[in-house]
A protein has these predicted regions:
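Conserved hydrophobic beta-strand positions in leucine-rich repeat
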Residues: 78-80, 104-107, 129-133, 157-159, ...
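Inter-repeat linker/turn residues at the boundaries of leucine-rich repeats
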Residues: 65, 73, 99, 123-126, ...
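Short hydrophobic alpha-helical "box" of cullin-RING ligase substrate receptors
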Residues: 40-52, 66-67
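A structural signal for leucine-rich repeat
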Residues: 92-96, 118-124, 144-150, 170-176, ...
Length: 367
């Protein structure tokens, strides 16, 4: 720590010298010359703060009132995930100061965060767009109600593992946070119900990514509501949603034309009918995809997890592979996951056929 302080003093001395006449006289005669740390321009201070870790930025905000005001007004991204024991008190102390925050990461390894902290965030940080509350096991519906009232500009929300939230509170939140594009509900067994998904489908039409992993109460009614209400959906994780059937996948295939990633791990009610509906949407939407072929973003499925979907047959999955060349079964590029489906080992992606054609083009040497 002493070494760091000496380095800072050395740098400060150089700034004072170069700010004046080259021999140190700038401290007395230069106009606007840096003579103390508090004289550093706000733009330079924020640039320096952007290069250090969040803990250092917080310490810097306590150096003097000038630094405090500059950092509190200029800091837009903050992570407190490094705090192992005192996160709740930190939030209660910092949220009223850092009112311009747009991104706040409060991911935890053990229970720390309480409703009082989230309520303070909602009261003070109205510009918040990205909030990570994952593994906040102590939080109750009070937190979601507070966010609904205070943070209407949320675009990305991660509440994975927050098992105490109810579907009523989640539905209420969706009615106020209508700009949501990325929502992680993995493990939110009570909150992620068909009733909540109907509310999300009705209110959050801009939604692009939704993680419903291991939300075992989710059924076809909820997923179909999402498919109809969120046509721009790009990524949907339904892994462990054991109640869904082909009807959910068919609704997604017909309505979510930009869907690129779909997780169906352990959805054992899924049959070939669902897979063929995905494969055929490539043909049905061929003209639409031609119109966007110049976009940087690739259209069509590029990731699919059908592990443990034991009712599927090779012809259906092969048809899907043929329709979407970006789905790979080859080593190192696995984007079609079929673990636990021993009857699908014959399915191969386009790379395998290309390699076979290349090998066939060269005659075997004579023995």
């Amino acid at each position: 720590m002493v070494g760091k302080a000496e380095d800072l003093d050395l740098c400060f001395g150089k700034m004072m010298v170069f700010g004046g006449d080259g021999v140190g006289g700038g401290m007395m005669r230069g106009v606007g010359v840096i003579t103390e740390w508090k004289d550093i321009p706000m733009e330079l201070l924020l640039r320096i703060v952007s290069l250090v870790d969040d803990r250092t930025a917080i310490v810097a905000s306590g150096v003097c009132s000038g630094w405090r005001d500059a950092i509190c007004l200029g800091l837009t991204h903050l992570s407190l995930s490094w705090s192992k024991n005192n996160m709740n008190n930190l939030v209660l102390s910092l949220a009223p100061k850092f009112t311009k925050l747009q991104v706040l990461i409060l991911r935890q390894d053990k229970q720390q965060l309480e409703d009082s902290a989230v309520e303070t965030i909602a009261k003070c940080c109205h510009d918040l767009q990205d909030l990570d509350l994952s593994k906040s096991f102590k939080l109750s519906d009070r937190s979601l109600y507070a966010l609904a009232r205070g943070c209407p500009n949320l675009i990305k929300l991660n509440i994975s593992g927050c098992s105490a939230f109810s579907d009523a509170a989640l539905g209420y939140l969706s009615g106020f946070c209508r700009k949501l594009k990325i929502l992680n509900l993995c493990g939110c067994v009570k909150a992620a119900s068909d009733r909540a998904l109907k509310a999300i489908g009705y209110n959050c039409g801009q939604l692009q990514s939704l993680n419903l992993g291991w939300c075992e109460n989710v059924g076809d009614v909820g997923v179909m509501s999402l498919a109809y209400g969120c046509p721009d959906l790009r990524a949907l994780d339904l892994c462990g949603c054991v109640l869904i059937t082909d009807e959910s996948v068919i609704a997604l295939a017909n309505n979510c034309l930009h869907l690129r990633s779909l997780g169906l791990y352990y959805c054992q009610n899924i049959t070939d009918r669902a897979i063929y509906s995905l494969a055929h949407r490539r043909l049905n939407n061929k003209n639409m995809w031609k119109s966007v072929k110049n976009r940087h973003e690739e259209e069509g499925l590029i990731n699919l997890n059908i592990s443990q979907c034991t009712a599927l047959t090779p012809p259906a999955v092969q048809a899907l592979c043929d329709s979407f060349p970006a789905l790979h079964t080859c080593p190192g590029r696995h984007s079609l996951i079929i673990s636990g489906c021993l009857n699908l080992t014959s399915v191969h992606c386009a790379c395998a056929f290309q390699a076979h054609r290349t090998a066939s083009a060269f005659p075997h040497p004579a023995h």
